[in-house]
Amino acid sequence: KLLVKDDGIIAGIEFAKQVFTYVDPQIKIEQLIKDGDPVSYGDIAFYVEGASQSILKAERLVLNAMQRMSAIATKTNTFVKLLEGTKTQILDTRKTTPGIRALEKWAVKIGGGTNHRFALYDMVMLKDNHIDFAGGITKAIDKTKSYLKENNLDLKIIVEARDLDEIKTILKSDGVYRILIDNFNYEDTKT
């Protein structure tokens, strides 16, 4: 059985089922709770039945993944709850642990967050260096839109803002999907 050792949001049950089944298709799993459910110390997530060698072979990977995923889902859910009633979403980052990005981003979704970008290829992000090199925000956005059109690419544009004036400039531009606020203090984010 998988015994829950802390309160939080459980994550990684579907992954655990895949691992156990991959190691031994004869393993039987009785699932009692699902990914995203709130759990408390002492809850049982599932029972596993099968050859002890197969269970032990999969056990450490399952436990490590579920601990990490549940921690991420729990932390994400804490912030999601704080923002209930607003239009604000919790987004994850592309900066993840090498080799387990998919699991970490899956955990964010389980916790109620939204995936930002999976990799460099799925959105265009204009950072401060790009903006400076292009000669300003408006020029950077216009050049990016032209490039996307010329190359028949359907990618969303995200622009990083360093201050409130840059946000105002970005908001006047057409075609920006998201604004990334960089190192803003709490008071500035409320503005």
Task: For each feature predicted by the language model, list its residue ranges.
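Acidic/glycine-rich phosphate/pyrophosphate-binding loops and surrounding catalytic core
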Residues: 1-173, 190
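Short glycine/threonine-rich loop/turn motifs
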Residues: 171, 180-191
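Receiver (REC) domain switch/active-site residues of two-component response regulators
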Residues: 177
